[in-house]
Amino acid sequence: MSKVIHKWKSISLIEENVTLPTNVVVKHTTINHPGAAVILPITSSGKIILINQFRPSLKKWLLELPAGTMEIDETPLQCAQRELEEETGYSATSFQSLGQVTPLAGFCDEIQHLFVAKDL
């Protein structure tokens, strides 16, 4: 059994029965997320570009790397290129993948694709 409890843009809150490796069935709630790209932009002089964003869920400003949610049919690289330009005004000619992380794996299926952007 799987049901959508709430949906916002491309993110859903899903409740479903999951069979654990021990064959025990539990009800689990997951945030279904399309994935994201996180970019480490480095200027030709070796400086890292960060952005200052207000995060309503924490009610404070945070200094962050540029990042954003993948759009439908968008590759991780395309997302990284788009987000870098949208959030910083910079574009890069060189993107290197650093792999991926799943920072909230206990309750969210989001995969964050990590990139270094150079030649801004």
Language model feature labels by segment:
Residues 4-9, 56, 101-113:
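Acidic pyrophosphate-coordinating catalytic loop
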Residues 4-38, 43-44:
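Acidic, metal-coordinating catalytic segment for phosphate/diphosphate chemistry
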Residues 14-22, 104-120:
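Active-site-adjacent beta-strand/loop module that shapes the phosphate/pyrophosphate-binding cleft
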Residues 18, 41, 50, 90, ...:
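Conserved hydrophobic "DFG−1" position in protein kinase catalytic cores
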Residues 28, 37-82:
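Conserved Nudix-box catalytic region and its N-terminal flanking loop in Nudix hydrolases
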Residues 54-56, 82-86, 90, 113:
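Recognition helices and adjacent regulatory flanks at domain boundaries
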Residues 91-98:
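A short coil-to-beta-strand element that immediately follows conserved catalytic motifs
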